[in-house]
Regions:
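Oligomerization/assembly interface segments of phage tail-like spikes and tubes
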Residues: 63-77, 121-133
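Small/polar-rich, solvent-exposed N-terminal microdomains that initiate assembly or binding
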Residues: 1-58, 81-82, 146-165
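Extracellular/virion structural assembly segments
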Residues: 60-66, 74-93
Length: 165
């Protein structure tokens, strides 16, 4: 079961509900063969890595996981209403504070110009969120609690119970 894919999917679903002029897709498996179909541009969502905090537990491993997501904006223009700069503004507003599945709210890390080629302007926005990575353990078959007898300190012992000899 993937913990990362649901994060990407929930970001995609959220951006689709907030931005209507651009295609919003997961980063392609083969970027060299990617074809921009949308007349305005696209926002590509990519897992960019994770960092884990130090282990402090002595029994089960549980670590805070800081997940980095790259949002690549590809636009056919830079300055008009459908341009890269306008869409970057919309993406920032949509993503800051959004909580992907099983995560804390998203925060911005960095944004930079990635280049221009054949009239396509590219910017990359790095976003981070946090979740937990927890060790998977097998259930241990321990004896089950059968009966509980309650009493106050002043009550006599239950006759079913025998004191240790």
């Amino acid at each position: 079961m993937s913990a990362t894919q649901p994060i990407l999917n929930s970001i995609q679903t959220h951006l689709l509900s907030q931005i209507d002029r651009f295609a919003i897709e997961l980063f392609p498996d083969n970027p060299s063969e990617y074809f921009l179909r949308d007349e305005s541009g696209a926002i590509l969502i990519q897992y960019a890595g994770s960092k884990f905090e130090r282990i402090n537990s002595t029994d089960i491993i549980q670590q805070r996981r800081t997940v980095t997501i790259a949002l690549t904006v590809i636009a056919r223009s830079q300055h008009n209403d459908d341009g890269a700069l306008a869409i970057l503004d919309q993406v920032r507003l949509a993503i800051v504070g959004f909580r992907p599945e099983n995560c804390l709210a998203c925060a911005l890390i960095n944004e930079e110009f990635a280049g221009e080629a054949d009239g396509l302007w590219q910017y990359q926005l790095l976003v981070q969120t946090e979740t937990w990575q927890v060790e998977q353990t097998k259930a241990v078959d321990l004896p089950k609690l059968a009966n509980v007898y309650s009493r106050k300190p002043t009550d006599p012992l239950n006759p079913i119970l025998q004191p240790k000899s």
